[in-house]
Amino acid sequence: MLVDASGRDDAAVIRLSAERALVLTTDFFTPIVDDAYTFGQIAAANALSDVYAMGGRPLWCLNLVGWPREKLPLDLLGEVLRGGAETAARAGATILGGHSIDDPEPKYGLVVVGEVHPDRVTTNAGARAGDRLVLTKPIGTGIVATAIKKGAAGADAVAAATAAMTTLNDRAADAAREAGVRGATDVSGFGLLGHLGAMLAASGVSAEIWAGAVPRLTGVRRLAEEGHIAGGTRRNLDAASRTTAFDPALDEVERLILADAQTSGGLLLAVSPASAAQLTHALTSHKSLAAAIIGTVSTGDPGRITVRAGSAPT
């Protein structure tokens, strides 16, 4: 066992030989958009992301389905499954089957098995003092999804969030591999602050980030100001606040955005200063949605985060 659950990492990694290791993960959730096909795409991309965060490539998947068969037609489920299958195919993975149950609320996701060379595993314990922190997607999907459920999200915000959530992290993982990245995690349900904190704790380091350097989706600040904040995001902020020192200039809305629970978020990468420019160039070349240096890893209390109000590291 190369990676287990003890470090709160994104997936398990099991060595099979000197040249090959398996990556195993699973994820599923309820719909966050209205369109069934798009929901399937997002759920699949979200599950596949854990394999990319570990430096691997997906091979096989199993569907996980909960469906209210007496309330919603099965052809609608077919659209969910089509979205998932086509997204898995884009990742080079095959869906081999799965399991479904009758459920009062629809749910969909995947079990994913991938592979990685044992010497090329990226983990959330790989950050080192001096590393630059790079984010590969804008944040804010939780806020937009909450606004969608209330019918309050504008077309531009919906389009931007949907594009982000349906984008695979494969190209970002390729760029990370090219730059020799060893520290990585994907930003999902615990938000940027939560996943960064877990990475820092696992690595035995602390970090300083700049709120203004963190990319965010179109219209997120306005939607957050209007109160479209999920309960999970508030819990994320409560938890993160125990180990995070915020610049007094950052208001509660800004802090909530940084703690926003993400779905199919980007990769958070820790890269050496010497390789930071190579990584951001590779991300740009691979057409990553973002290639933002948002902070620096440092020595100090493991898991401790300092958030500055500036727009860039100084």
PLM region descriptions:
Residues A12-V23, T166-A172, L237-P248:
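Acidic-glycine-rich active-site phosphate/pyrophosphate-binding loop
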Residues L16-V33, T38-Q41, R57-A153, L192, ...:
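Glycine-rich anion-binding loops of enzyme active sites
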